[in-house]
Curated annotation (Swiss-Prot):
EC annotation from Swiss-Prot or TrEMBL: 7.6.2.1
Membrane-spanning parts: 98-118, 121-141, 322-342, 366-386, 1111-1131, 1143-1163, 1193-1213, 1222-1242, 1253-1273, 1290-1310
Name used for this protein in its record: Phospholipid-transporting ATPase VD
SUPFAM superfamilies xref list: Calcium ATPase, transduction domain A, Calcium ATPase, transmembrane domain M, HAD-like, Metal cation-transporting ATPase, ATP-binding domain N
Impact after mutating residue 700 to A: In strain: CAST, MAI, MBT and PWK
Enzyme category, top tier: translocase
Entry-linked InterPro entries: ATPase_P-typ_cyto_dom_N, ATPase_P-typ_P_site, ATPase_P-typ_TM_dom_sf, ATPase_P-typ_transduc_dom_A_sf, HAD-like_sf, HAD_sf, P-type_ATPase_IV, P-type_ATPase_N
Naturally occurring in which organism (per UniProt): Mus musculus
Membrane topology summary: Multi-pass membrane protein
Biased composition (Basic and acidic residues): 1392-1402
Tissue expression from the record: Expressed at low amounts in liver, brain, testes, and kidney (at protein level). Expressed in placenta.
GO terms classed as biological process: monoatomic cation transport; phospholipid transport
Entry's Gene Ontology cellular component terms: endoplasmic reticulum membrane; membrane; mitochondrion; plasma membrane
Length: 1416
């Protein structure tokens, strides 16, 4: 509710929050109180002057005061007001709204005696009431924020005191930059701090960042390099270094700086060393850090931008019409002024009408007319709908409530429903014309399953794994069923007590329980400590993803990897085949080339609720930790490993000298046809005795035979939990584990991998070069434990890896063999992509120590740089990632989500043009497009894949010419069109699809080709942009939106989709497995793509229709009622006199006629949800804005003028010649106007419920009750008028009832006849669909069938006509490529048949070659 209140005042709050440093206030989002936001929705602030952080110690006192003492403390203040400034500041903010200023001007104007229209005090009442209500609401909200701020600021943490020389309890608000802070497990980090110590022996700290980015997976942060090898906790008194870093900014993914020791030695700092405010320490007993940013300068607080404000298309249209109403008001007031001047001129000589001023002066008619103009402004002010904007906001809140209450949006597996984060653009959901969708995680499940691989040029189909996936169904475990039976989700169960950070044994089944989803209660000290904490389950760890079935051929080859084979000391004449060593390196790369965190599956992750923070002393956690230290068993130590240090003992030189990983062995191909292409390589002569071999086996921990090891998974593998940042990494690690190459542990210094036949090997981790969208790859630099060589393992997109391969390999193969491997792998990659698999290439590089030292020196300079660090690091990575040796490729399957094809088809029928923007390769994207029905088998597909900008322009011209011929439109006629063809125009042209690659898209986005590109895409129903970067995605959305002037809707699930989500009219985030960045940046968040169809086709249609008609109704009722006052001016000399008491005039719009349109705007349903989903083409009415066109607005005003004429002159002629007074004449006018206005809404309503009727009758009764009470009790409220008994007298007069009935009938007759004729003679598609809802089920089904059949026949006929026209023309340069692509992509059934045949052929000799040639 707080967010709703914040949004209502967001547009004027921005102008008054620019305060400095600790006292500045920013809009606050209480959804994430401690973290204050998610992924930054604003452009990162440029770092200006660098920040120098000096330790808060006695020895640095003077320097500290000069630097760190000038920074803000950790106190936060999100309140806006104080007791002294509340009234003036709140009024200042409220008067930033133009409507409030307008009515304030009218109040002041009414205090001018010459233009006064009503009693002065009365005119102030409406504005005062509105301002008071909003002020009370703002005050209560601000007081609530004050209490929460106070609670947070008074939280306790451990801060090192330079006076007491120890850590003491200190409030968060007193923490300053330079303080040393000690945190325990499960504590929330109070400020941004650099990690200096961790109790973990490897210098690792685990944190949970769900408050920042929504990701529940644990993240690793590491101690600053040089502080890892500490035997004891860091002593602040011995800390003699200083920190220099960038100025505070809101970029959560970046931290640049360095730590400079007393000897001027520098150590680079990155985000891996930074603990952010709002995160929680997990699985680490204690950490120590130094504060670098505090309070409002922390990254979390800088990301707290509050709710974003967007204006909908309908709101912009309404604002334009408000200006037309202002113009109409001015015209009516000018008419009144001129009329009064003319009237006075006619009676200038008659003193009865020309009364002089008290001083005897006579005012000229011209000046009097000027005064009357302003009097008329006050009198007719209601023409500007003051209650319109308030009513719109109330209606939108009601619409949001019903959207969020729709059970069809509930995802039972994720226990989540739709989130409406933008509250003012619901109606735009009904007018979307372009949809931009990510692929992975949006259209697909984002459950990456290892499907196939290619190693050393040989394809491995994994047939058994394919069969498992086809028949796989995730079964609910007995434990989960029991949980559901006992009380639903864990969030609804009693919270377990907080536990220590040591490992707790898992349950009897050995399966991890669901992760805790709620906050725990405060740590108690009562009994019942026997509660077992629920264990957590990592993401990307469902059985479908983890249970990989190995390929038997590949497993047989990998089983040849024995200690004797590696060392060449088996006493035989054979040497190890090169292919086996390729396989070994391939799986090593899969296991270690990632950032996967390895942990036990049953480690508890307790959460601390805000309600318990204030009363939870730190010593409670310490007591619980001590209990578990006494009760738990020490972590079992790993077996003896061959780390870089250990393996050098003994006689390593002799051992390593005899190992030749790439020492000219020969390939041993399994297929005859492929083996003929590879030359044999001379053997290496190696010999040794058995005794030496056994010693070496013991040195590397090889204690089991390969046959025994391969018979089952390693004993410890089932106890490991992999937490990956992306599902691809997890899938590759699980695939390596399936081949008994198990990632056992990872620290900042080393990675341990367990081989079935070799035991555990420890790789010294030298560097990790993370993935980025520029390089499209990641690498790890390790020192091999056996060869002692520096090896670079790289994985990434095939488009970039293939360009980085070395011509002359250093592994004993000649260039011809490398070329054969490369060509085979490329054929396999193309085949994988055509099957819709996600592809990656794996490569390696061996470096000498000299080469590595030279690269390291340059890389160190990049790491310690603050300015341009990202660019320098990319350049350094590119210097390393070259001259690679290709090891193989992987194909990972990511299945479509349930209901995606049906949703895509429905959105197509709704006239929405859909673009797929993906980073995958072309073949994969096209295959998924066919699978999800974005493309149909008979669609004409055009491919844009060029290497130059000129070629791109020529190809686009050729494709455009072909499309124009297919549409039977000459190029001259097409080029003469001012506007591009819209989606609805393309229905009769035959469907066309366009595929464009990332590099070609870069050319197309150039200014010289933008218009041509947009014109081409406007002719296509579907566009696929593959290999697109996040920046290109946002540029495409902006280009289409700005040039076509259409409403755009991007949808995505990952951080790479945030940019395009933010630049569009409506952004949709999918809450998937890649964190919550997209959700936090979106306007609406859903859990599955199929929910989008109902959100747009049903709720979008309803919201647009309701709000459009409600806005038109407000204009109608205000114009109709104000014109009664205007027509009366013709009979009172345009004097600005009202025939209605001002109290009635005020409440007529604010009370008697305001509630029914609000109910209409919330509950109106022109067509049922079932019909809207079955007939998606009804959505096109919203795209064409049929409910609210400019013509509709002016027709509504003309109808209002007509009804006001009838409402005025029927009573006028009825009472003409009678002796009734002015207010007695005005009473039947008001009563008839009330009936006309309320019944007008009844005629416009498509679905009347008991709520509609109750509100309508209630409005009428409240009017009569008020009129009777006012006439009896408020006789002298508005002197000199006397309303005593007016309504009572009229209710006793039959003529009054006759006048009201006759007036209402005559006024509404044209509107009623128009609606009758519209529904019977020329019904719109929406009205026809409305009739279907009234039919019995059998007749309704038959009617819908006829509707769809007619639409299908028309569509097929138009398609056949366009295809015949296309066949008569000459083919374009792109058509041959299209035919090739279409021939390679078939329907779903044919594709499954072909895949089965390929799988069978893959296991037979010679089949791989045949498959590769056919694919090429």
């Amino acid at each position: 509710m707080t967010e709703l209140l914040q949004w209502a005042r967001h547009h004027w709050r921005r102008l008054s929050h620019g305060r400095a440093q600790g006292e500045d206030e920013r809009p606050y989002n209480y959804a994430s109180l401690l973290a204050c936001g998610g992924k930054s929705s604003r452009t990162p602030r440029p770092a200006g002057k660098h920040r120098v952080v000096i330790p808060h110690l006695q020895c640095f006192k003077d320097e500290y005061e000069r630097f760190s003492g000038t920074y803000v403390n950790n106190r936060i203040r999100t309140t806006k007001y104080t007791l002294l400034n509340f009234v003036p500041r709140n009024l200042f903010e409220q008067f930033h709204r133009a409507a409030n200023l307008y009515f304030l001007f009218l109040v002041v104007l009414n205090w001018v005696p010459l233009v006064e229209a009503f009693q002065k005090e009365i005119t102030m009442l409406p504005l005062v009431v509105v301002l008071t209500i909003i002020a009370i609401k703002d005050g209560l909200e601000d007081y609530r924020k004050y209490k929460i701020d106070k609670q947070i600021n008074n939280l306790i943490t451990k801060v090192y005191s330079r006076k007491e020389k120890k850590y003491i309890d200190c409030c968060w608000k007193n923490v300053t930059v330079g303080d040393f802070i000690r945190l325990s497990c499960n504590e929330i980090i109070p400020a941004d701090m650099v990690l200096l110590f961790s109790t973990d022996p490897d210098g690792i700290c685990h944190i949970e960042t769900s408050g920042l980015d929504g990701e529940s997976n644990l993240k690793q942060r590491q101690v600053v390099r040089g502080y890892t090898e500490q035997d004891s906790e860091v002593d602040p008194e011995k800390f003699s270094s200083r920190i220099e870093c960038e100025s505070p900014n809101n970029d959560l993914s970046r931290f640049r700086g360095f730590l400079e020791h007393a000897n001027k030695e520098r150590v680079g700092l990155s985000k891996e060393n930074l603990l952010l405010r709002g995160c929680t320490i997990r699985n680490t007993e204690a950490v120590v850090g130094i504060v670098v940013y505090a309070g409002h300068e922390t990254k979390a607080m800088l990301n707290n931008s509050g709710p974003r404000y967007k204006r909908s298309k309908l709101e912009r249209r309404a604002n334009t019409d408000v200006l037309w109403c202002v113009l109409l008001l001015i015209v009516m007031c000018l008419t009144g002024a001129l009329g009064h001047g003319i009237w006075l001129s006619r009676y200038e000589n008659m003193l009865f009408f020309n009364i002089p001023e008290p001083d005897g002066r006579v005012i000229s008619p011209v000046l009097t007319g000027f005064y009357v103009f302003w009097t008329m402004i006050i009198l007719l002010q209601v023409l500007i709908p003051i209650s319109l904007y308030v009513s719109i906001e109330i209606v939108k809140l009601g619409q949001i409530y019903f959207i969020q209450s729709d059970v069809d949006f509930y995802n039972e597996k994720m226990d989540s429903t739709i989130q409406c984060r933008a509250l003012n653009i619901t109606e735009d959901l009904g007018q979307i014309q372009y949809l931009f969708s990510d692929k992975t995680g949006t259209l697909t499940e984002n459950k990456m399953v290892f499907r196939r691989c290619s190693v050393a040029g040989f394809d491995y189909c994994h047939e058994e794994n394919a069969k498992r996936l086809e028949s796989y169904q995730e079964a609910v475990s007995e434990e989960e069923e029991c949980t559901d039976t006992l009380g639903g989700s864990l969030s609804n169960m009693a919270r377990p007590r907080a536990q220590g950070c040591r490992t707790v044994p898992s349950g009897p089944l050995g399966k991890p329980s669901a992760q805790l989803s709620g906050s725990t209660s405060a740590v108690g000290n009562g009994e019942g400590s026997g509660e077992v904490p629920h264990s957590r389950q990592a993401a990307f760890s469902s059985p479908m993803e983890t249970d990989v079935v190995p390929d038997t051929r590949l497993l047989d080859k990998f089983s040849q990897l024995t200690p004797q084979l590696l060392t060449g000391l088996d006493g035989t004449a054979q040497s190890s085949p090169l292919e086996t060593l390729y396989i070994m390196d391939f799986f090593i790369a899969l296991a270690i080339c990632n950032t996967v965190v390895v942990s036990a599956p049953n480690q508890p992750r307790q959460k601390i609720g805000l309600s318990s923070l204030g009363g939870m002393p730190i010593k409670s956690l310490e007591e619980i930790k001590n209990i578990f230290q006494k009760l738990s068993v020490r972590r079992s130590s790993s077996p003896s490993l061959a780390s870089g240090k250990d393996s050098s003992s003994g006689t390593p030189c002799a051992f390593v000298s005899r190992i030749s990983f790439f020492s000219r062995p020969k390939l041993s191909p399994p297929m005859e046809d492929e083996s003929s292409q590879m030359d044999e390589i001379p053997q290496a002569s190696n010999s040794a005795c058995c005794t030496e071999t056994e010693a070496q086996n013991r040195a590397v921990g090889l204690s089991v035979s390969s046959a025994e090891a391969l018979s089952g998974p390693p004993p410890s593998a089932s106890n490991l939990c992999y937490e990956a940042e992306s599902p691809d990494e997890a899938a590759l690690v699980y695939a390596a584990r399936a081949y008994r190459c198990t990632l056992q542990s990872r620290t900042p210094e080393q990675v341990m991998v367990d081989f079935a036949a070799l035991g555990s090997l420890t790789f010294q981790l030298l560097h990790i070069l993370p993935f980025d969208s520029v390089r499209k790859r990641m690498s790890v630099v390790v020192r091999h434990p056996l060869s002692k060589q520096v090896v670079v393992y790289t994985k990434g997109a095939d488009s970039v890896i293939m360009e980085l391969l070395s011509v002359a390999a250093s592994d004993g193969t000649n260039p011809e063999q490398q070329m054969i491997i490369r060509e085979r792998t490329q054929r396999h990659l193309d085949e994988y992509a055509k099957r819709g698999l996600r592809t990656l290439c794996v490569a390696k590089k061996v470096m000498s120590d000299t080469e590595y030292a030279e690269w390291l020196r340059n890389h160190f300079l990049a790491e310690t740089s603050i300015d341009n660090r990202e660019e320098l690091l990319v350049e350094s990575a590119m210097r390393l990632e070259n001259k690679l040796t290709l090891l193989g490729a992987t194909g990972i399957e990511d299945r479509l989500q349930e209901g995606v094809p049906e949703s895509i088809e429905a959105l197509h029928q709704a006239g929405i043009k859909i673009w797929m923007l993906t980073g995958d390769k072309q073949e994969t994207a096209v295959n998924i497009a066919y699978a999800c029905k974005l493309l149909e088998p008979d669609d004409k597909l055009f491919i844009l894949n060029t290497q130059s900008q000129d070629a791109c322009g020529m190809l686009m011209s050729a494709i455009l010419e072909e499309l124009q011929k297919r549409a039977q439109v000459s190029p001259e006629l097409a080029s003469s069109r001012k506007n591009f063809p819209q989606p609805s125009d393309a229905q009769g042209q035959g469907r066309a699809g366009l595929v464009i690659t990332g590099k070609t898209l870069e050319f197309a986005l150039q200014e010289s080709l933008q218009r041509q590109f947009l014109e081409l895409t406007a002719w296509c129903q579907a566009v696929i942009c593959c290999r697109a970067t996040p920046l290109q995605k946002s540029e495409v959305v902006k280009l289409v939106r700005n040039h076509h002037h259409v409403l755009t809707l991007p949808i995505g699930d990952g951080a790479n989709d945030v940019s395009m989500i933010q630049v569009a009219d409506i952004g949709i985030g999918v809450s998937g497995q890649e964190g919550m960045q997209a959700v936090m940046a979106s306007d609406f968040a859903i859990s599955q793509f199929r929910h989008l169809s109902k959100l747009l086709l049903v709720h979008g249609h309803w919201c647009y229709t309701r709000l459009s008609n409600m806005i038109l109704y407000f204009f109608y009722k205000n114009v109709a009622y104000v014109n009664l006052l205007f027509w009366y001016q013709f009979f009172c000399g345009f004097s600005g006199t009202s025939m209605t008491d001002y109290w009635v005039l005020i409440f007529f719009n604010l009370l008697f006629t305001s509630v029914p349109p609000i109910i209409y705007g919330v509950l109106e349903k022109d067509v049922s949800a079932e019909t809207l989903l079955q007939l998606p083409e009804l959505y096109r009415s919203g795209q064409r804005s049929e409910e609210y066109l400019p013509l509709t607005f002016w027709i509504t005003l003309l109808d209002a003028f007509y009804q006001s004429l009838v409402c005025f002159f029927v009573p006028y002629f009825t009472y003409q010649g009678s002796d009734i007074d002015i207010f007695t004449f005005g009473n039947p006018l008001n009563t008839a106007a009330l009936f006309i206005i309320l019944l007008h809404l009844v005629i416009e309503s498509k679905s009347l419920t008991w709520i509609h009727m109750l509100v309508t009758v209630g409005s009428i009764l409240s009017y009569f009750f008020f009129a009777l009470a006012f006439g009896a009790l408020c006789v002298t409220c508005n002197p000199p008028s006397n309303p005593y008994g007016i309504m009572r007298k009229h209710m006793l007069d039959p003529v009054f009832y006759l006048v009201c009935v006759l007036t209402t009938f005559v006024a509404l007759l044209p509107r009623f006849l128009y609606r009758v004729l519209q529904g019977s003679v020329f019904p719109s598609p929406v009205l026809r669909a409305k009739y279907f809802d009234r039919l019995p089920p059998e007749e309704r089904a038959e009617a819908l069938k006829r509707w769809r059949g007619t639409a299908k026949v028309n569509h097929v006929a138009s398609k056949h006509a366009s295809q015949s026209a296309a066949m008569s023309g000459r083919p374009t340069p792109g058509s041959s490529a299209v035919l090739a692509m279409k021939s390679a992509t078939v329907s779903t059934v044919e594709q499954s048949t072909r895949e089965t045949a390929l799988d069978r052929g893959c296991s037979e000799p010679g089949a791989s070659k045949m498959t590769g040639s056919s694919a090429s």
